[in-house]
């Protein structure tokens, strides 16, 4: 999506990707919808992917509007479609859609429930507060894929494979999920019991192989609130410029004393999301 701000607050010069997945089997499952601003494109892509078939299940892992906005119209378009979601999601649906129009076509799932599609089977994992209370993740056991909702996401639209995933994933994590370290640790413990070939997040690229292993390592590190690398963040706000001079002087003194990495951030002008990222990344503030 070609936007300059994500959630009207995070600067995203490279835009933002919103992912939705389709599993074609004896039964057809659609994994989440997308942002309402991409309704026409998403619907056209879905129709093309279905190639004449009718979806049986729409899995709602996360009720945040950038992933659920098209649920109502999709349920209307496919009268036999069943919406699969957590009980918490059911409580929220009525605030966004005419729930009465498809209330009888809702399947509530919880931790440990499974949904066979044919060759593929969906296994549901409760992931509350990563980063909304109703979130579920889904493990597909045939191809060993973890559909991770907003977990393992990143800022930016889909780019080439040489891009540094960690750079914008780090800024995304600490601003979106940073205060939910305990909840992320709980999900990682559940994931550690699974054989995973790929992680499919709702934002950013699919992760496999070494990239996936590194992403899991970083999520474990970040969610334990351990510094990722050595460094010092000097953050300041300065009305008349004197505190700014002091902050920059302090940075120079720290470098003279042997500090290998000193980052100086103006809280009034610099990207706040990057400042928060650095506050978590470095051991000294």
Explain the meaning of each model-derived region.
Residues 1-27:
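Zn-dependent metallo-beta-lactamase
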Residues 22, 29-30, 123, 139, ...:
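Conserved beta-strand elements of the Class I
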Residues 26, 37-84:
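Active-site metal-binding motif and surrounding structural segment of the metallo-beta-lactamase
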Residues 31-33, 55-63, 83-86, 146-150, ...:
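Active-site neighborhood of phospho(di)ester-bond hydrolases with catalytic His/Asp-centered motifs
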Residues 47, 114-117, 273-280:
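Short amphipathic alpha-helix with an adjacent loop that forms part of the alpha/beta core around
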Residues 85-210:
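Metallo-beta-lactamase
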Residues 211-285:
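N-terminal beta1-alpha1-beta2 submodule of the flavodoxin-like/Rossmannoid cofactor-binding fold
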């Amino acid at each position: 999506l070609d936007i300059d701000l994500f959630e009207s607050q995070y600067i995203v010069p490279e835009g933002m990707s919103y992912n939705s997945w389709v599993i074609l089997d004896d039964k057809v499952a659609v994994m989440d919808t997308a942002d309402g601003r991409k309704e026409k494109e998403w619907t056209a892509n879905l129709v093309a992917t279905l190639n004449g078939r009718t979806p049986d299940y729409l899995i709602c892992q996360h009720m945040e509007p950038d992933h659920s906005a098209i649920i109502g119209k999709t349920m209307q378009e496919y009268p036999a479609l069943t919406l699969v979601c957590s009980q918490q999601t059911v409580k929220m649906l009525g605030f966004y859609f005419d729930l009465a129009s498809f209330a009888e076509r809702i399947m509530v799932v919880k931790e440990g429930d499974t949904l066979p599609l044919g060759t593929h089977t969906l296994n549901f994992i409760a992931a509350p507060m990563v980063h909304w209370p109703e979130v579920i993740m889904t493990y597909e056991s045939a191809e060993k894929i973890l559909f991770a909702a907003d977990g393992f996401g990143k800022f930016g639209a889909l780019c080439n494979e040489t891009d540094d995933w960690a750079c914008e994933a780090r800024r995304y994590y600490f601003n979106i999920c940073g205060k939910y370290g305990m909840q992320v640790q709980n999900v990682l413990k559940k994931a550690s019991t699974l054989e995973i070939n790929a992680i499919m997040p709702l934002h950013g690229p699919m992760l496999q192989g070494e990239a996936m292993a590194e992403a899991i390592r970083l999520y474990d590190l970040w969610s334990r609130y351990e510094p990722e690398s050595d460094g010092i963040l000097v953050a300041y706000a300065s009305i008349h410029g004197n505190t700014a001079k002091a902050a920059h002087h302090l940075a120079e003194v720290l470098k003279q004393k042997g500090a290998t990495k000193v980052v100086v951030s103006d809280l009034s002008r610099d990207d706040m999301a990057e400042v928060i990222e650095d506050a978590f990344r470095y051991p000294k503030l």
